[in-house]
């Protein structure tokens, strides 16, 4: 099966024609069922609660304390490359991670403005810096829940997943060097991210770039 947030929308509904389904293998459905639509709504809600609502509450609670009790406060958020690059079989997960990324980067700009304001007993609040870590798949328990086809097995290259230790070391190096912003891992995915940004903003005469990105995504996720 697979975690609903890492399934195609129709897979969450239980009727993906390509055979990637949350609980069933119904490929012949021509319309959504009420149960399927309810599962989509519940999946979106759970994913947004975990990736957007939770971080927003934590940031709202901790930022005032960090601004007034630390001289060099910093926040590290573990996002995902799925929040930067659209991917088949990851629609809900990509959407919630993208929202999480924009939440963090927007709050970063807000903290930049707030750093100039006074605080009780202090001339000004400290500037809170942010590092957004956007790794590819990591070798942990979540990887085991990724989309699985009933006949072909996993839909992605799990053998290429990052080691937890590698992600931790890279993150600590950036924090120690006070290099904030976005850390994409592995590095070659930064190129894919840049190409995705160009794909969304550049009006080109042919569909060559879009076709290239689409082929790469379909090959990567085998969908």
Report the location of each language-model feature.
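Conserved catalytic-site region of short-chain dehydrogenase/reductase
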Residues: 6-7, 83-85
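Active-site loop immediately N-terminal to the catalytic Tyr-X3-Lys motif
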Residues: 87-91
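Active-site Tyr-X3-Lys motif and surrounding loop/helix of classical short-chain dehydrogenase/reductase
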Residues: 8-49
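SDR active-site lid
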Residues: 108-189
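Active-site helix of classical SDR
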Residues: 59, 96
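Residue(s) in the substrate-gating loop at a strand-loop-helix junction
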Residues: 80
